[in-house]
Amino acid sequence: MKEAIIVDQLGIYKEPTLVADDETGVSSIITYKDSEGGKQTAIVQGHIVAVPVPEGLHLPKWDFTQEQWIEGKPADELLILQKASKLAELKRLCTEAIEGTFTSSALGEEHVYSFDMEAQLNFQSTKELMNMHPNFTQTSWKTRDAGVLMHTKEQFTRLWLDGQMHKTNLIEKFRRLEKELEHATSVDAVNSIRW
């Protein structure tokens, strides 16, 4: 047994059903109604389409003329859905990029630092502590590539600024792509926007 799709007379997707593995194409769902004179009249209630629905269709519709699945959702509604989906994708990718890692040469050579939410809070609280206490002139900080390294107050301030620039640059990238998304007038234009 395999899955097929029941569609109405217009080809609109109604529900899935099971058919024999060897069944292909389109078959009609017929009911019979008694009519005058004892004759039965065949009434087509819908169709079973034993053709797989391609991925990416939001409202699959069977086109009886072309004998293939097409998008049944109006283009303007489809564009709205695609924009919402793309915006959610861009937000997720931006957050992942921000909370990933960044590089800094605050120590004179480049090192990789974590910037997840915990690291961001630790950066902020350490910076505030250094600003409030003049005797707090250095701190050890974990890098992703060289373990824990000592940072002077000046080096840590530079590191903090590099982290903030990492975040700011990614937010600016998100805003630029968000603006591009707002101005997109077709699904193809939306799909062409990449993080």
What are these regions (language model features)?
Residues M1-W195:
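A preference for well-ordered globular domain cores
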